[in-house]
Amino acid sequence: MVSTLDDTKRNAIAEKLADAKLLQELIIENQERFLRESTDNEISNRIRDFLEDDRKNLGIIETVIVQYGIQKEPRQTVREMVDQVRQLMQGSQLNFFEKVAQHELLKHKQVMSGLLVHKAAQKVGADVLAAIGPLNTVNFENRAHQEQLKGILEILGVRELTGQDADQGIWGRVQDAIAAFSGAVGSAVTQGSDKQDMNIQDVIRMDHNKVNILFTELQQSNDPQKIQEYFGQIYKDLTAHAEAEEEVLYPRVRSFYGEGDTQELYDEQSEMKRLLEQIKAISPSAPEFKDRVRQLADIVMDHVRQEESTLFAAIRNNLSSEQTEQWATEFKAAKSKIQQRLGGQATGAGV
């Protein structure tokens, strides 16, 4: 049987993503405080722009965590560091310049974390790269913010040392630095638009793409340990996806998608869950393991084709953009709770 659904490398990346979410929340908290403390209109406007970007980026990080499929808590050392920085920002030990300098270091830490997650994903699997893809937007935004924060620090530092304003060429240099890489900024998630979230079709399609990659990776591998790793992720992803659809989506579409078509979706997922449990009881090195996985993949991809054609069309024809975005938010929240439950279940030998 499959001895564990967990994988050490994937869990380590999940912890890094949890760290990034906690840091992003601190970054937002700092910038809200800076707006209350700043007396410079130009600096306030820059920080206000940062805040808008970073609130969206927090949504992107939350989406990536759900798509990644493993929920973890931030590391204790990171929680302690966040508490220490929060105390410094709330206190009077540091002046405004020093607080912004500490904040720029946080941005740098967030950039490096994002790059490390991307590099680690290249080693773990194509499905991980697919799940964390939107983090590229967060990384580019943070690099752009770093350049602007350097400009802010130059202005504040000159004022502190001389009591006078710095030369006006600072912002021009900052904009030139940003332009060197800003062309790569963009995201299919929420950044660069007025959307508050992805729509439900986009979120479900991302799940479909990821599990398809996992099936391909599993079938191409001859390493029982990697096969076990891929199946563990397939099991958790499909379980969370199916339960979230049955909680948030299917009951709501029945009225306009039709009783028969909706019931077919339920029936397909019931068969999928049955096969998942059967496969979990088979050793990854057994000859029939891949055959059963192939059977599961066929059922899943038939299900995918139905959802992405007729179901998505029915959703487009019956819901507003705001409604599909709200459904996406609720779907991700439901998946997150299910993932936390799955992560808390015993996954040692005998699973």
Curated annotation (Swiss-Prot):
Residues holding Fe cation 2: 245, 303
Keyword set includes Iron: yes
Entry-linked InterPro entries: Hemerythrin-like (IPR012312)
Signal sequence interval, chain numbering: none
Keyword S-adenosyl-L-methionine: no
Induction: By desiccation.
Alphabetical keyword list: Iron, Metal-binding, Stress response
Matching Pfam families: Hemerythrin
Binding, Fe cation 1: 241, 245
GO molecular function, one term: metal ion binding
Function: Acts as a DNA nickase.
Family to which the UniProt record says this protein belongs: Belongs to the hemerythrin family.
Name assigned to this protein: DNA nickase
Species name: Nostoc sp. (strain PCC 7120 / SAG 25.82 / UTEX 2576)
